[in-house]
């Protein structure tokens, strides 16, 4: 069983904070038309996400704040870039709306599960779909070199994200709508 602490200042959490601070940098690079630099920065940010998770697990630096902050940083980065790309005409509006609805439902399900004393952990399929979504976002930065194929990458990633969401909802349905064992009904 993994050990969790209340400590905030450790390497994984600092890497997560760096990711949060780099969101406006990535967005600004995109808006200013510096797509290659924006893409490189986005990829580096994604690599810090992998690194902080690895360090946290390997060296027992998992914290309660990190468990919450890490996925928030991931979502904020992805959504910020997707919104920016939509405003720039790089990503169709329906893709952004689909991702917003999915993330809103995930947030609602997680909040309901938490209210009932449960947690809804992510799984490998969800992590793979998130990786592919980030890959498609990175491809959007390099669309000058990829042509329209970056959109096909995004559509495949979006399809997998939707499948992962459906699977997540089915697997976690009971956790979302039932009280944890030992909890009293109100």
Name each region found by the language model.
Residues 1-186:
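Alpha-helical transmembrane bundles and membrane-interface segments of multipass inner-membrane proteins
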């Amino acid at each position: 069983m993994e050990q969790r602490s209340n400590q905030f200042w450790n390497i994984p959490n600092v890497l997560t904070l760096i990711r949060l601070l780099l969101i406006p940098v990535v967005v600004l690079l995109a808006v200013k038309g510096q797509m290659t630099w924006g893409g490189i920065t986005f990829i580096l940010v994604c690599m810090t996400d992998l690194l902080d998770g690895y360090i946290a697990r390997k060296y027992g630096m998992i914290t309660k704040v990190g468990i919450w902050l890490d996925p928030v940083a991931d979502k904020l980065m992805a959504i910020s870039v997707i919104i920016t790309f939509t405003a720039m005409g790089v990503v169709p509006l329906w893709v952004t709306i689909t991702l917003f609805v999915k993330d809103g439902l995930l947030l609602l399900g997680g909040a309901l599960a938490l209210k009932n004393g449960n947690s809804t952990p992510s799984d490998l399929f969800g992590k793979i779909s998130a990786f592919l979504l980030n890959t498609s976002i990175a491809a959007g930065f390099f669309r000058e070199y990829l042509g329209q194929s970056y959109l096909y990458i995004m559509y495949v990633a979006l399809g997998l994200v939707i499948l992962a969401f459906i699977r997540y909802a089915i697997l976690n349905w009971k956790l979302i709508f039932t009280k944890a064992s030992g909890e009293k009904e109100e």
